[in-house]
Swiss-Prot record:
Organism: Porphyromonas gingivalis (strain ATCC BAA-308 / W83)
Gene Ontology CC annotation, any one: cytoplasm
Catalyzed reactions: tRNA(Asn) + L-asparagine + ATP = L-asparaginyl-tRNA(Asn) + AMP + diphosphate + H(+)
Primary subcellular site in the record, as a coarse category: cytoplasm
Enzyme Commission numbers on file: 6.1.1.22
The name this protein goes by in its record: Asparagine--tRNA ligase
Domain of life, source organism: Bacteria
N-terminal signal peptide: none
First-level EC class: ligase
Length: 469
């Protein structure tokens, strides 16, 4: 083969502008079929869901070499791009030279030409990117990341890197992964018999972050508008299709935004991401819709059609209580003060309003200490964006900007002042109204791909009893 000829991506070759030209394509064999005279090889290089058909005239190739071209093998092909004679593709490559880079033994290669369950593919997460399904998901994942950066960059917000190792529990959930270099077989002890973390690497107890919000707020108080986008960690022992121990979060924090502005930003942001997916990932979305979720494209368009409903928590509870009176059955009870379950959120979105909902003004007891207290003294300016199929997709609030009120709320919620002294400083010096929210990246991907298990939208899922690869 001509080593100097530049490789053409299959996605570019399929556009048809190169018909009649000699091209060099490389990729992995999906299938091979044929007869004694000719072989048809379906080749994929990851640039598109679509394969390139390679037509190999067996009179021109060594039989031993051709026998090594099996599903999973990696090959390079030089040939002429021509309009296809057969159905199923518009163009194909008439091969003049083939080089085999790597073989795949059909006796052991697990991705043969047949359907595989998602459960099976999770067990071989190192190979599942080679399937059509996961190629589509990972391309969409890339595009959603680009959409997020583009949206905030165009807004004039700055990408801010919050630390992954932290000494604070932002959410007060207590489900954090500890970071330590201490030897468990010979732990240093204080006089009281407690582990002496002063002897640890950081000189104190540290954990992996559950959120970059608090640090993000510090940056917003100087840069005006920022967003974080990085991994977060929760040591929550939940083996469900909605939970991961390691996932990615997008968290904008913006000075001078009040709760109404925050809701507007969240709606504009999520609609931008969905529109980006429809504009840039339609081939992959169509494939996933056909195979996993026939209503996917309609659901994506549904989000874009109308303004999101703004709904106070108290009114939401009234609607749900009314539904129960009218015979609707919920697994979890409804009462003022309850933290809504996914079934309640989905009822409001899918049945009652038939449009996404932004719920606001939650009871202070079920929300975090940093949320701004309303004048009623009972509710806070929290807001959750509720979506069809998945329930809550975004959670945020206007932050408490008043130093005394923030200290009082921290004490109320059992958050020690000594642990958040630096956070309180932002209210002590030049405080300002500000707001923000968090979007779980994988939650967004569940919605955009139509997949039903969160372990299928991240390359290597980390869950209880599973840290393979």
């Amino acid at each position: 083969m001509d080593k100097k000829m530049k490789r053409t991506r299959i996605a570019d070759a399929l556009h048809g502008g190169l018909v009649g030209q000699e091209i060099n394509i490389k990729g992995w064999v999906r299938t091979k079929r044929g007869n004694k005279a000719v072989n048809f090889i379906a080749l994929n290089d990851g640039s598109t869901i679509h394969n390139m058909q390679i037509v190999a005239d067996l009179a021109s190739f060594d039989a031993a070499q051709m026998s090594q071209i099996t599903t999973g093998a990696c090959i390079g092909v030089i040939g002429t791009l021509v309009e296809s004679q057969g159905a199923g593709q518009s163009v194909e490559v008439q091969a003049s030279a083939i080089e085999i880079y790597g073989t795949a033994d059909p006796a052991t290669y697990p991705l043969q030409k047949k359907g595989h369950t998602l459960e099976f593919l999770r067990e071989i997460a190192h190979l599942r990117p080679r399937t059509n399904t996961f190629g589509a998901i990972y391309r969409i994942r890339h595009h959603m990341a680009i959409a997020i950066h583009t949206f905030f960059h165009n807004k004039g917000y700055y990408y801010f890197h919050a630390p992954l190792i932290t000494a604070s529990d932002c959410e007060g959930a207590g489900q954090m992964f500890q970071v330590t270099t201490l030897n468990p077989d010979s732990l240093p002890r204080t006089e009281e018999g407690q582990v002496d973390y002063r002897k640890d690497f950081f000189g104190r107890h540290t954990s992996l972050t559950v959120s970059g919000q608090l640090e993000g707020e510090m940056a917003a108080m100087a840069l005006g508008g920022i967003y974080t986008f990085g991994p977060t960690f929760r040591a929550e022992n939940s083996n469900t299709p909605r939970h991961l121990a390691e996932f990615w979060m997008i968290e904008p924090e913006v000075a001078f935004l009040e709760i109404e502005d925050n809701m507007d930003l969240a709606e504009e942001f999520i609609k931008y991401c969905v529109q980006w997916a429809l504009d840039n990932c339609m081939d992959d979305i169509s494939f996933l819709s056909e195979h996993f979720d026939k209503e996917l494209i309609d659901r994506l368009k549904f989000v874009l059609e109308k303004p999101f409903v703004r709904l106070a928590y108290t009114e939401g509870i009234r609607i749900l209580e009314e539904a129960v009176k009218n015979g609707v059955k919920f697994e979890f009870p409804i009462y003022w003060g309850a933290d809504l379950a996914s079934e309640h959120e989905r009822y409001l979105v899918e049945v009652h309003f038939k449009t996404p909902v932004i719920m606001t003004d939650y009871p202070k007891e079920i929300k975090s200490f940093y949320m701004k207290l309303n004048d009623d003294g009972k509710t806070v300016r929290g807001m959750d964006v509720l979506f069809p199929k998945i329930g809550e997709i975004i959670g945020g609030s206007e932050r408490e900007a008043d130093y005394d009120k923030l200290v009082a709320r921290a004490n109320e919620m059992g958050v020690p002042e000594k642990d958040i002294w630096w956070y309180l400083d932002s209210r002590r010096y030049g405080t300002a109204p500000h707001s923000g929210f968090g979007l779980g990246f994988e939650r967004l991907l569940l919605f955009v791909t139509g997949m039903s298990n969160i372990r299928d939208v991240i390359p290597f899922p980390r869950t209880p009893n599973n840290a393979e690869f």
